[in-house]
Amino acid sequence: MLYLVATGDYKGPSENHLSFTKGQRIEFLERTENGFIKGKLDGKVGIFPSSLITIETRPLSIIQNQPIKYSTETKDDTGSISSSTSTSTSSLTTPRAESSKDASGEQQPSTSTINGQSSSTSPILQSNGTTNTTTSSTSNNNIGDNISEKSFGDYDDTTSNHSKSASRLSVASFSTTTTATTTTTTTTTATSSKDKDKKDKKEKKEKKDKKSKDDDKSEKEGLYRKSKGSSSSSSSSSSSTKRRYANRKACEPWVVKKYEDIPEEVKSDMLKEDIPIKDIQDHFKLFLRILKFITRQKITLLIPIDPTIPTKEMNLLDLSDAESVAKSTTMFTREEIRTSAFDNVDAFVDAPIMDDNEKAAKTTEIKLERKRILTGISTEFLGQASTTIRVIPSSDIKKRIKFTHMVGRGQYGKVYDALYDKKRVCVKVVNYSTPKEQHNVLQEIGFLTQCDHPNILKYNCSVLYGSDLFIVSEFIQGGTLEQASASSHVFKETQVGFIGLELLKAISYLHEKKLIHRDIKAANVMVSTDGEVKLIDFGLCASVEKGGSQHMVGSPYYMSPEMIRGEECSYPSDIWSFGICILELLFKKPPHRDSRMKAMFYNAINGIDFPKIRCSIDLKDMLWQCFESNPEKRSTVDKLMRHPFFKRCESKSQMKSVFTDMFSTSSKNSISTTGFF
């Protein structure tokens, strides 16, 4: 008998639905259609959404529509059918689907460790609480380096990543498994060998990480990432060079009351930012907020309780001295600098949790719940998105998906020009193993499935293969608006008008559905040789009605002032980002391109400097409506679409020739490093 645990409250809308509260145990009976599960609770039989149940931290919100397989007999060595001597019963398994087979169709054994005991990479959770073993294989995450120019057949399906398998939160399916005693013995022997290899690899990794931390110690001390082996003097590149900021999340938290309290190495780097210190002092809290967003540095700001306290007396406090810190508690209130309403996750983690693994799992769970709140989605939303994921046998997948060349590479995956069922498509390959990875992918898929508009990328389906997910979408022959802006072509205002109007149509569609994109930028807009303009990348999309409005997300150059300042954000934020895209088309780069910090800082306090914009009066007026600092006075998308500027834009047929000339000569291996969607 298999039991499931409810991860949330659910009230059935009809009599054939079960109702339960978080933490209740539900007896599993069978899986039904549309992501629902049939179970038994307190003697009542009914259905409920799979997104609200879990078993040993493996949520079933991503259950696939795979048939339930029952097997009560096994073949012995002589080939005859005999009853199994294993104690295995009906169980829940985390599949690697058919992808666990190699090219010959045979499964290869692979092991990992769960709760200190050896097991297969696909642990079977039995009804009696014990762990059995099956044989499986983990696919190589570096799929981009193993895909042939002509076909999928050269994909290297190895077991090199078996150590990651224990923590994987992957698409689950139901099956019953029986294992012969001889198989269990063989697997146990293999497990011992694998555990030894795993231990050796872990020790090597720890040594490598320690060395890396020692080598990069100076990197964490400053504001910027330093190239390996470079000195501090060599790191002072020119202002025209795009700088890479250091990730200071693991650095010592700051407690500051003024700019002078910031560490010297950071203040030294700030001299390269071309931001006057006086401006930073006048907008110190805003500066700290931007600094936290860019570097993830933990910061606490001390604010005077009594404004009449002399500034000189406050400045004499040495925050590195224990006595001064104790005195500061009577003079200041402490305010943690945040980029969202739920920044401090540690405050929500139960204090009694002592085990590091349990605490890490709890922290991850809280972070994902926080993200769902801020984007206005639910576990049901993710469960519905997971129903578009397909599990195809490896023998068929190599015939149905054929990769050609890579057309894009981003932070979360690679994009390939491919054939799916003999139809040309784009396939984005992403890791799909950890809870965070799965949550992010399902969130994007969920919003894409809600959209059906000619100016928004059309999502087809997703295919699970090992620990990777292939996100299949329509193929677009062309490139990004960022690539178009950086080309030698100089856009006329009439051409800018066509692109802008098409993009506004996509934004209008989202706003009508009570959604905001929150990451509109030139790299997230595709233009095709057919004269089409499509909005892509819905990873930061959110619901206006259900989501949190105070959350700092997006791309620094395109971020609206209200989002940078920590105010409530809604539809006007997308309008601001749209305006920056228009400026990039006109001037080939967004304002303050040389520094993300400078762009965010001055966009938040000064807005856009209109006198420097040389264009027609109606275009300048349209941009003025986009860049109104007060979001309540900023134009709406419908009002912008009726603006006179867009009445003189070029036609689709005219733009078709422009985009064809722009992208027809580009190499097939030319990629956009900013991502695809």
Swiss-Prot record:
Domain SH3: from-to ranges: 1-58
Domain Protein kinase: 401-646
Enzyme class: transferase
Domain of life: Eukaryota
Pfam families according to UniProt: Pkinase (PF00069), SH3_2 (PF07653)
Active site per UniProt: 519 (proton acceptor)
Residue spans of biased composition, Polar residues class: 105-126, 158-174
Coiled coil ranges: none
EC number of this enzyme: 2.7.11.1
Cofactor: Mg(2+)
Region of interest: Disordered: 72-244
Gene3D superfamilies: SH3 Domains, Transferase(Phosphotransferase) domain 1
GO molecular function annotation: ATP binding; metal ion binding; protein serine kinase activity; protein serine/threonine kinase activity
Residue stretches of biased makeup (Basic and acidic residues): 209-224
Positions bound to ATP: 407-415, 428
Alphabetically ordered keywords of this record: ATP-binding, Kinase, Magnesium, Metal-binding, Nucleotide-binding, Serine/threonine-protein kinase, SH3 domain, Transferase
SMART domains: S_TKc, SH3
GO biological process, alphabetically ordered: cellular component assembly
Catalytic activity: L-seryl-[protein] + ATP = O-phospho-L-seryl-[protein] + ADP + H(+); L-threonyl-[protein] + ATP = O-phospho-L-threonyl-[protein] + ADP + H(+)
Annotated protein name in UniProt: Probable serine/threonine-protein kinase mkcF
Organism, scientific name: Dictyostelium discoideum (Social amoeba)
Gene encoding the protein: mkcF
